[in-house]
């Protein structure tokens, strides 16, 4: 069976937009290649050959003052009427228990 025929659930991916909120790790040494906008359209383009039917977004280390914003933003992405798969289908947000 070809991988393209398989239904895939991506259980760990990230989206971010450093133009709207701050992600400190994007500017730290060694992460320069990631310091760009990476939205759902980019995710879909990167994996267009795969049959991703659902996905789980894991928090992308947005600054602590923006953790709720990140989950709200991702929910809006999922709810967008142009997003026919409603990705991400699950969101794992950040919670500081310390």
Q: Predicted regions span which residues?
A:
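Helix-coil boundary/capping segments in enzymes
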Residues: 1-98
């Amino acid at each position: 069976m070809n991988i393209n025929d398989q239904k895939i659930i991506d259980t760990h991916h990230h989206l971010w937009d450093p133009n709207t909120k701050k992600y400190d790790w994007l500017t730290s040494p060694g992460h320069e290649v990631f310091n760009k906008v990476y939205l759902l359209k980019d995710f879909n383009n990167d994996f267009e050959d795969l049959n991703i039917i659902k996905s789980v977004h894991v928090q992308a280390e947005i600054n602590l003052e923006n953790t709720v914003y990140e989950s709200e933003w991702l929910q809006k992405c999922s709810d967008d009427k142009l997003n026919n798969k409603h990705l991400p289908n699950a969101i794992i947000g950040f919670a500081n228990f310390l």
